[in-house]
């Protein structure tokens, strides 16, 4: 406790870090306040049925969690940040196939800015498609016509589309500003704060269900909390675990502050078991809405009914099989993008370092690629198992669905991953200013090895 108090005092003493944290908290507060602002012309009291259904889990529960309740509230942020996530998926997938995007990726900062601009425009396009679908879909979700105070007129639809698109763009802007001037990844923090906002209600509903319905009582609640803590610890291990590649140096003339300098200090290259972080989960979850949507296009046909029945139930067999497969695929895909083994090999060669038994240059790059493939496969399976664990606990012990979403799956992994990433950034600021960090001996040394 004394160490935590000392760390808080240290954070307060560092002006830049203090301002970054306050800036982040302020923008997160703006986002949460916006999630409570209902679209003009919509009666919030008439949305109670949609809100209660979304609290019970299912696709509605995930949508509502990702938007922090904005989806069920028909808020100006009802679309949340998911259109931006979807746009990022498309751009990164196209970056593998389109020469133009591949060229931009190699142009450094200027290319990154152009890719960001393309992602923004694609986000707007997705918003324009999703906004009317959301407005017309409210009736299918059980919202009565009386909820629309002035009726669902063309003027109301047009105005609401503009507001929803603007809300998504504003949320995207908030996320980018947090990343640039705050602490942590802004987009991930927006999703996390929305998920955390739904946690107390989900736990309360599960507690009431266990006690009032004689469904295990407090003993079962205690067991669930114990299992939850174990899953959190396993998730932390997944995020933090690294494979250490030993490095030897023939000479030590590395430039201070560079990646090669850091390698020289620690005498090994740390390759993370889950180098892609939470992004495979977010990407896979974004695509999991597609099968049910495609099924609705086919209407009452056999294919349409099967798609809607199989992929609208997030605790069902087919949904979780596809979800797990997508998590594995995106883990490999995103790791290939985010781990620049060629650059690591070049930096190592320039600093006079080499992996024992491996020639510097291309052979080292191929070796690092091989090791990454070896550790990414079990890491992706580990990630997929945790991702589908909510469905397992629902089927095995009959847990309340809204609370089960926090037993692994998208919600827990995002919260754990974002929390660790944010803590590591705060830790880096503290260590750079010669204060004791949040981790005993630095973020890299505290990681478990495999």
Model segments located where?
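N-terminal cationic and glycine-rich segments that engage phosphates or anionic surfaces
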Residues: 1-105, 110-450
């Amino acid at each position: 406790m004394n160490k935590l108090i000392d760390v808080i005092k240290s954070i307060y003493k560092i002006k830049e870090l203090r301002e970054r944290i306050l800036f982040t908290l302020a923008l997160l507060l703006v986002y949460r306040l916006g999630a409570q602002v209902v679209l003009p012309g919509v009666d919030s009291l008439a949305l109670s049925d949609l809100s209660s259904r979304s609290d019970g889990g299912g696709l509605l529960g995930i949508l509502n969690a990702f938007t922090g309740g904005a989806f069920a509230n028909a808020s100006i942020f009802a679309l949340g940040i998911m259109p931006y996530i979807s746009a990022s998926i498309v751009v990164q997938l196209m970056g593998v196939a389109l020469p133009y995007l591949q060229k931009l990726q190699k142009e450094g900062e200027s290319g990154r800015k152009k890719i960001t601009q393309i992602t923004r425009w694609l986000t707007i396009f997705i918003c324009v498609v999703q906004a009317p679908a959301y407005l017309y879909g409210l009736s299918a979700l059980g919202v009565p016509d009386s909820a629309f105070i002035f009726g669902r007129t063309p003027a109301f639809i047009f105005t609401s589309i503009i507001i929803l698109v603007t809300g998504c763009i504003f949320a995207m802007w908030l996320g980018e500003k947090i990343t640039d001037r705050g602490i942590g990844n802004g987009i991930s923090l927006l999703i996390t704060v929305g998920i955390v906002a739904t946690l107390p209600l989900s736990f309360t509903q599960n507690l009431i269900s266990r006690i009032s319905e004689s469904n295990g009582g407090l003993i079962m609640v205690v067991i669930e909390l114990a299992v939850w803590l174990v899953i959190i610890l396993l998730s932390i291990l997944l995020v933090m675990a690294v494979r250490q590649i030993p490095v030897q140096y023939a000479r030590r003339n590395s430039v201070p502050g560079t990646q090669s300098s850091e390698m020289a200090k620690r005498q090994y290259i740390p390759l993370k078991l889950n180098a892609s972080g939470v992004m495979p989960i977010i990407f896979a979850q974004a695509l999991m809405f597609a099968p049910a949507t495609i099924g609705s296009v086919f209407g009452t046909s056999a294919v349409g009914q099967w798609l809607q029945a199989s992929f609208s139930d997030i605790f069902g067999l087919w949904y979780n099989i596809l979800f797990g497969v997508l998590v594995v695929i995106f883990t490999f895909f995103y790791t290939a993008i985010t781990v620049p083994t060629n650059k690591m090999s070049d930096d190592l060669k320039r600093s006079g370092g080499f992996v024992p038994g491996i020639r510097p240059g291309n052979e080292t790059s191929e070796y690092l690629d091989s090791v990454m493939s070896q550790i990414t496969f079990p890491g992706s399976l580990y990630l997929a198992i945790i991702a589908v664990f909510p469905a397992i606990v629902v089927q095995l012990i009959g847990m309340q669905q809204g609370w089960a979403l926090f037993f692994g799956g998208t919600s827990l992994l995002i919260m754990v991953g974002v929390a660790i990433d944010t803590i590591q950034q705060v830790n880096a600021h503290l260590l750079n200013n010669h204060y004791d960090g949040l981790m005993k001996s630095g973020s890299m040394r505290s990681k478990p090895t495999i």
